[in-house]
Amino acid sequence: QLDIPDYFNFAFDVLDARAHAADKDALIAIDLAAGTRKAVRYSELSATSARFAKALMALGLQRGDAACVVIGRQPEWHMVLFGCMKAGVISMPGTNLLTAKDIAYRVNQAGAKAVIVSRQHVEKVEAIRSECPTLQHLIVIGAADGDWLSFDALCAAQDAAHDPAELPPFPSTDTMMIDFKSDTTALPK
């Protein structure tokens, strides 16, 4: 039998604890094509996720709201997911292979209020956004155009300090993530 605490949030209780206890490399991103290697420390991951959580809340997203996340293998994927956890926003991560139709299905099934995508998926979201009545916020990793918001700019506008009044603990029974499972013959379940 597991002893489950009343309040538990992986981003606060594991990530932030690790950042304070022993700040080491949390992620190493290697871009073979560009020949670059970028290390992200636990402290950076913790601080950026706190900034992003506050940015989501500043946009009006609340505990229990959903966000569709389609970001490739890059450090921001982790920052976004941990930020969603800290804000109580339910993340719905998706693979880079998702089509515009796949993204629309996920957004509509969950009533997602935000999409957070890498640049390569902006065109897909633009193609379906009018079909997604709950979608209110479009966030892109990198530079933003039109009514899209830049992840970097959103994070830069927020303080990284963790104030429990701003980012309160949530019950361990809260939904953290929705994972759509699918195969090649049917819609996701």
Where are these regions (language model features)?
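Flexible, non-catalytic linker and terminal segments flanking ANL/adenylate-forming cores
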Residues: 1-11
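A broad, structural micro-motif
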Residues: 10, 39-40, 98, 170, ...
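AMP-dependent adenylate-forming
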Residues: 14-41, 142-146
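Conserved pre-ATP/AMP-binding loop-to-beta segment of ANL
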Residues: 23-25, 140-146, 159-187
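Conserved AMP-binding/adenylate-forming core of the ANL superfamily
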Residues: 26-82, 99-104, 152-156
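Structural core segment of the AMP-binding/adenylate-forming
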Residues: 58-59, 82, 86-153
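Surface-exposed loop/turn positions
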Residues: 65, 89, 173-174
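Conserved S/T- and glycine-rich ATP-binding loop of Class I adenylate-forming
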Residues: 67, 84, 115, 175, ...
